[in-house]
Amino acid sequence: MKIYLVGGAVRDSLLNLPIKDKDYLVVGATPEQMLQLGYRQVGKDFPVFLHPKNQQEYALARTERKIALGYGGFSCHASPDVTLEQDLLRRDLTINAIAQDEKGNLYDPFNGIEDINARLLRHVSDAFVEDPLRVLRVARFAARFHALGFHIAAETLALMRQISASDELNALTAERVWQEVDKSLGGPHPEVFFEVLHQCGALEVLFPEIFALFGVPQPEKWHPEIDTGVHTLMVLAQAALLTEDKSVRFAALVHDLGKALSPKEHLPKHHGHGQKGLPLIKALCTRLRVPNETRDLALLVSDQHQNVHQAFELRAETIVKIFDKADFWRKPERLTQLILACTADMRGRTGFENNPYPQGEYLTQCFLAANNVDIAAIIAAGFQGAEIKQALNLRRIEAVSQFKQKMQTKLPTDEQ
């Protein structure tokens, strides 16, 4: 029985990156032997065991055979006669198919170290096409290692296109797709994930609402990049620079879905696109089973981002209505999230990347003024029942109005 460290831990060690999880491969052992040594079996489809002391995962060497559609359509064969190389052969990328024994010796039958040095994401074998999830995984690795200069090998991208053109992607469960999206949204370059999916044809299959934005023009005055799809990924990139909040990043990604519905005769203008996008966001979130909080913020940003951009032009009554509709009184963090997404939207345009966004501070101060209205004083003044809410609303409007009067600078409208 021989034990090897495999996968991401070996790869990240060679890249001098922090190691998060360690996965081990056991060659030449049976499930019975593992149980006798105190390991606890947790894998149902194939033998995976937890170490009796540190609870790290140890998997028996195995081979796989495709028997059905989807990432789960495999028959696994685990036995003591499966070799190290046979197990590594079934892995997705060469950089993930390197093993290290207990003495520190590296085993690299598919030249993964060479590809690490060349910053290349390359498939191990043509069996790559049997697992559609690998399209998403490679896109995620491209995003994760973008700053290190990694790129996808042309022949691997060709196989990803082959998968996208088949029915395999449709066999992926919503949970697995969202899991990959969620991981990518948490990385430093989530926009690269979607760029890769667009390049290989998977975006059209899995995210048709986002795919539909590419080729849709916008006014060049406000959008020198013109293409709405390009703008969308620029906004996502800016959101990633502004915050680690994955919900804000997702909201940035889908804030302009309604622009795909603008009548061709009205292009490049997009009147009411924020509201037009709401059903598209709901459908996307339902299909992928996006968490409710993430969905709700995305809907808020789509609905209100045009108002936020034009904050200096809004009447006090309109501003308070926005605060009411979004329930910022109970969820003030939502205002911060909305402003972050709108800042990303403003900066996600060619030449606007470093511009200030005074609308954010302006709305924050409006909210503080409105939120400082003393409800106790209203009750003490003798208001009762529905009168309390009416009086509170009027005093909030007055507070915002007084703040607006103090503001001397008024920026020109910047339509997004």
UniProtKB/Swiss-Prot annotation:
One Pfam family this sequence matches: PolyA_pol
Cofactor note: Magnesium is required for nucleotidyltransferase activity.
GO molecular function: ATP binding; CCA tRNA nucleotidyltransferase activity; cyclic-nucleotide phosphodiesterase activity; magnesium ion binding; phosphatase activity; tRNA binding
Binding site for CTP: G8, R11, R91, R137, R140
Reactions catalysed, as given in the entry: a tRNA precursor + 2 CTP + ATP = a tRNA with a 3' CCA end + 3 diphosphate; a tRNA with a 3' CCA end + 2 CTP + ATP = a tRNA with a 3' CCACCA end + 3 diphosphate
InterPro entries the record matches: CCA_bact, HD/PDEase_dom, HD_domain, NT_sf, PolA_pol_head_dom, PolyA_RNA-bd, tRNA_CCA-adding_enzyme
Residues spanning the membrane: none
Sites where the protein binds Mg(2+): D21, D23
Keywords, ordered alphabetically: ATP-binding, Hydrolase, Magnesium, Metal-binding, Multifunctional enzyme, Nickel, Nucleotide-binding, Nucleotidyltransferase, RNA repair, RNA-binding, Transferase, tRNA processing
Function of the protein: Catalyzes the addition and repair of the essential 3'-terminal CCA sequence in tRNAs without using a nucleic acid template. Adds these three nucleotides in the order of C, C, and A to the tRNA nucleotide-73, using CTP and ATP as substrates and producing inorganic pyrophosphate. tRNA 3'-terminal CCA addition is required both for tRNA processing and repair. Also involved in tRNA surveillance by mediating tandem CCA addition to generate a CCACCA at the 3' terminus of unstable tRNAs. While stable tRNAs receive only 3'-terminal CCA, unstable tRNAs are marked with CCACCA and rapidly degraded.
Domain comment in the entry: Comprises two domains: an N-terminal domain containing the nucleotidyltransferase activity and a C-terminal HD domain associated with both phosphodiesterase and phosphatase activities.
Subunit structure, interactors included: Monomer. Can also form homodimers and oligomers.
UniProt record similarity statement: Belongs to the tRNA nucleotidyltransferase/poly(A) polymerase family. Bacterial CCA-adding enzyme type 1 subfamily.
Note: A single active site specifically recognizes both ATP and CTP and is responsible for their addition.
Name of this protein: Multifunctional CCA protein
Lineage summary: Bacteria, Pseudomonadati, Pseudomonadota, Gammaproteobacteria, Alteromonadales
